[in-house]
Curated annotation (Swiss-Prot):
Family statement: Belongs to the GPI family.
Primary location group: cytoplasm
Catalytic residues as annotated in Swiss-Prot or TrEMBL: E351, H382, K510
Organism: Shewanella putrefaciens (strain CN-32 / ATCC BAA-453)
GO MF term list: carbohydrate derivative binding; glucose-6-phosphate isomerase activity; monosaccharide binding
Record's GO cellular component terms: cytosol
Single GO BP term: glucose 6-phosphate metabolic process
EC number: 5.3.1.9
UniProt superkingdom: Bacteria
Gene: pgi
Group of enzyme by EC: isomerase
Location of this chain's protein in the cell: Cytoplasm
Protein name: Glucose-6-phosphate isomerase
């Protein structure tokens, strides 16, 4: 057993699961439950009263956090200590949204100064493009941005841009390309005019396979449409650490934005990786996004555990995963603009906490990262909500909704809100056999049929959920929301004593993919591989089954 599972607090939590009343009873016996189990921070409101938790549960979870030195680990991250121990790196995405007056030293340098310089450079670039001063090779202004990246350099900008659609600058559109499948970029290029398109290539090394392949394809398309090599600088910019490769490609050194080792890809949207966001919504709104995240950083760093929103959410998720065998967690966004958030949080959480050894290399004997999934309401209510209500697996849920819509048409938002709140109530309350039978009392069914159908209509309830509200979806509230989930992820990793900031599984996949590519192109013999891989490669070479 690990030290974590041997601890008296862990054992107490395990025993405590046997003594919890149904949530129906918890609400019936405590009129102040909603008031006592909700809080506001940074423009967000969290109702966590619909959880399988009592005051005793929370005290035990806070004790577990203290036993795990959570507060010290939070301070270590903000101080720039080397908490990514396997790669010997600080973890300072929080510095990207810090105030200009702050000073944070990493690798012997004040990185806040570097961040502010980059923001100033971004501002100048954004203003040049959005004002129409930036001209393409035929003298026309830019109308379309194509952001080429993969992982965090793709998903973050795409999801945030999608969420902030009401704030987009008129006359500018953005397209996102990530997958190396040629269909992805081909379909995008069909829509574009080479004279008015600007490509942003985001890759720390300027050599990431998918990103480089797509960028080379974009360049070939540009040249085929009439652009010259000397025109590339007018239509391609880069976010990269490899200035040499970028300039060799044809990008002007003045149009290369930096990336830093102390920022992981899945935490990078706050950096120059967020350039597509800034182009679409303007730098004022981009800075508001950063400010919302900064407010959540300050809340996370200073609020007591019992009043700390990321801590509470992280502990409750851990509670279900480690003590109720919940293998997944669903994120349900009741706002069309936020429909991409489940995929973003999926990458954030699963790439961070999909680990099986502790920091000292000991195999864990407890579940770590759950499967994160979800979608937008109310669509999911006619699909996978059925599994959450009556399936055999426990699936904790997060419901996210703005109180005010950007598009207040008729009764749409009232119906959306009623569905959101109704779902959380149904999950908590369920339906007993007696209630189901009573609903059938006036039907034409026989008594025997009523008994049978009632059994099918029973829902156990006691299904946990959090509800996150904001007044309105703005750059600031979105920044706070994303930072909330970043820190929630950190909380769990800190208690599990794992490294939430490396991704060796991703690296292995990259390496093996490159190896297979060499064998597909016949540069290497594939017969040395396992029979399955060799057989698949041979089928691919044949081009037919």
């Amino acid at each position: 057993m690990t030290l974590l599972t041997q601890s008296s607090t862990w054992q107490a939590l395990s025993a405590h699961t046997q003594n919890l009343p149904h949530m129906r009873e918890l609400f019936a016996t405590d009129a102040a439950r909603f008031k006592n189990m909700s809080l506001s921070a940074c423009g967000l409101f969290l109702d966590y009263s619909k959880n399988r938790a009592t005051a005793e549960t929370l005290e035990l979870l806070f004790s577990l956090a203290k036993d795990s030195q959570l507060e010290a680990k939070i301070k270590a991250m903000f101080a720039g200590e080397i908490i990514n121990t396997t790669e010997k790196r600080a973890v300072l995405h929080t510095a990207l949204r810090s105030k200009a007056s702050q000073s944070i030293i990493a690798e012997g340098q004040d990185i806040v100064l570097e961040v502010q310089q980059t923001l100033s450079k971004m501002q100048e670039f954004v203003e040049t493009v959005t004002s129409g001063q930036w001209k393409g090779y035929t003298g026309k202004a830019i109308t379309d941005i194509v952001s080429i990246g993969i992982g965090g350099s793709f998903l973050g900008p795409k999801v945030v841009s999608q969420a902030l659609r009401p704030y987009w600058n008129q006359g500018l559109n953005c397209h996102f390309v990530a997958n190396v499948d040629g269909t992805s970029i081909s379909e995008k290029l069909k829509l574009l005019d080479s004279e008015t398109t600007l490509f942003i290539m985001s890759s720390k090394s300027f050599g990431t396979q998918e990103t480089l392949t797509n960028t080379l394809t974009a360049k070939a398309w540009f040249l085929a449409k009439g652009g010259l090599q000397s025109d590339v600088a007018k239509h391609f910019v880069a976010v990269t650490s490899n200035v040499t490769k970028a300039t060799e490609f044809g990008i002007d050194a003045n149009n290369i934005f930096p990336m830093w080792d102390w920022v992981g890809g899945r935490y990078s949207l706050w950096s120059a990786i967020g350039l597509p966001i800034a182009l679409l919504v303007g730098m004022d709104n981009f800075r508001a996004l950063l400010n919302g995240a900064h407010q959540m950083d300050e809340h996370f760093a200073s609020a007591p555990l019992a009043e700390n929103m990321p801590v509470i959410m992280g502990l409750l998720s851990l509670w279900y995963g480690n003590f109720f065998n919940a293998q997944s967690h669903v994120v349900l966004t009741y706002d069309h603009y936020l429909r991409g958030l489940p995929a973003y949080f999926q990458q954030l959480d699963m790439e961070s906490n999909g680990k099986s050894v502790t920091l000292d290399g000991t195999d864990v004997d407890y579940s770590t990262g759950p499967v994160i999934w979800g979608g937008e309401g109310t669509n999911g209510q006619h699909a996978y909500h059925q599994l959450i209500h009556q399936g055999t697996a426990l699936i904790p849920a997060d419901f996210i909704m703005p109180l005010q819509s950007h598009n207040p048409i008729g009764v749409h938002h009232d119906q959306l809100a009623s569905n959101c709140f109704g779902q959380t109530q149904a999950l908590m309350q369920g339906r007993t056999f007696e209630e189901a039978l009573a609903e059938l009392a006036n039907s034409s069914l026989t008594d025997e049929e009523k008994q049978l159908i009632a059994k099918h209509k029973v829902m156990p309830g006691n299904k946990p959920s959090n509800t996150l509200l904001m007044n309105k979806l703005t750059p600031e509230t979105l920044g706070a929301l994303i930072a909330l989930y970043e820190h929630r992820t950190f909380v769990q990793g800190a208690i599990w004593d794992i490294n939430s900031f490396d991704q060796w599984g991703v690296e292995l996949g990259k390496n093996l993919g490159n190896d297979v590519l060499a064998r597909i192109s016949a540069e290497q013999d594939s017969s040395a591989l396992d029979a399955s891989s060799n057989g698949l490669i041979n089928l691919y070479r044949q081009g037919a089954i």
